[in-house]
Amino acid sequence: MKREDLLTNVVDDLSLEDLRDLKNLEIIFDKVYGFSAENVVKAVEILRDLIKEADLRFLSFTANLVSTGLRGLLADLIRREYFNVVITTGGTIDHDIARSFGGKYYKGSFEFDDTMLKELEIHRLGNIFIPFENYGKVIEEVVRKYIPEIVSVRKDWSVYELLWEFGKRINDQHSILKACYEKKVPLIVPGVVDGSFGTNLFIVSQFNGLKIDLFQDMRLIKDLIFSSEKSGALIIGGGISKHHTIWWNQFKDGLDYAIYITTAQEYDGSLSGARPREAISWNKVRPSARSVTIYADATIILPILSASLLR
């Protein structure tokens, strides 16, 4: 099979406006009601109240979603100020920068010979195909191009302010970094070194004196938490982005609103599979909190929840 035969259909970004025809889906789910449909309806109700009543609103998600068309939707949710803090993983920066600077991702399939893909120099992320040259090379070039400019301003940076600097230099309305910069929404990435962007920062820092101060990000979250009256979170996926979100909320006696979208299960004791009720025992979610867990693929559920905000 030829490489060009696999790289034909580009992944496009979704916008909130694309979902306008779905805005009444919650009515359908309410009529269905049974089983998981009930939780979708609950999530819609909680999300609306979270946005209306919580002054501190977290959007937490994992990086794999940014390789899909959900990237543009996540950027829209930030740009429309539904959320004012974003917590994610290092790969989010990688995918957002790669796609913002011309790295095209392609529609592929789970069922492919990965040894063959490696020989064709194609990464596979689930059913997304990423040509080698559209990922690491792009990120490396962007970091090497802009870090000298940024370091000329100052050498010590928090992660969220450094990401704003990159967002300022992006000309792509579907970019999460750009949306965060425009709305001055802090993009908190506790695992920033776990990825291509962080590795490239480390490499260039050995030559130009760049210093990353994660404690500045922690001080920001601390100030936001202690000054908030109510907090809520839409948490998509698990891992470090989920835990960092609920961890900090324990210092205000827990989240007031919590919506989990996950495919992980709790039987193995993992953080990713833990439900909001377990977080109550850790003081990370209030006993009185309104919470719900939807067991589903976020690429299906997030558009439905987001569309409900258009009603």
From Swiss-Prot:
The organism's taxonomic lineage, starting at the top: Archaea, Thermoproteota, Thermoprotei, Sulfolobales, Sulfolobaceae
Matches recorded under Pfam families: DS
This protein's name: Probable deoxyhypusine synthase
Function text: Catalyzes the NAD-dependent oxidative cleavage of spermidine and the subsequent transfer of the butylamine moiety of spermidine to the epsilon-amino group of a specific lysine residue of the eIF-5A precursor protein to form the intermediate deoxyhypusine residue.
Pathway(s) where this gene product acts: Protein modification; eIF5A hypusination
Class of the enzyme per the UniProt entry, highest EC level: transferase
Any one GO molecular-function label of the UniProt entry: deoxyhypusine synthase activity
NCBIfam families, A to Z: PRK01221.1
Named cofactor requirement(s): NAD(+)
Organism this protein belongs to: Sulfolobus acidocaldarius (strain ATCC 33909 / DSM 639 / JCM 8929 / NBRC 15157 / NCIMB 11770)
Family: Belongs to the deoxyhypusine synthase family.
Residues forming the catalytic site: K284 (nucleophile)
GO cellular-component term (any): cytoplasm
Catalytic activity as recorded in UniProt: [eIF5A protein]-L-lysine + spermidine = [eIF5A protein]-deoxyhypusine + propane-1,3-diamine
EC number assigned by the record: 2.5.1.46
Gene3D superfamilies listed in its UniProt record: Deoxyhypusine synthase (3.40.910.10)
Keywords associated with the record: Hypusine biosynthesis, NAD, Transferase
InterPro entries tied to this protein: Deoxyhypus_synthase_arc, Deoxyhypusine_synthase, Deoxyhypusine_synthase_sf, DHS-like_NAD/FAD-binding_dom
Gene: dys
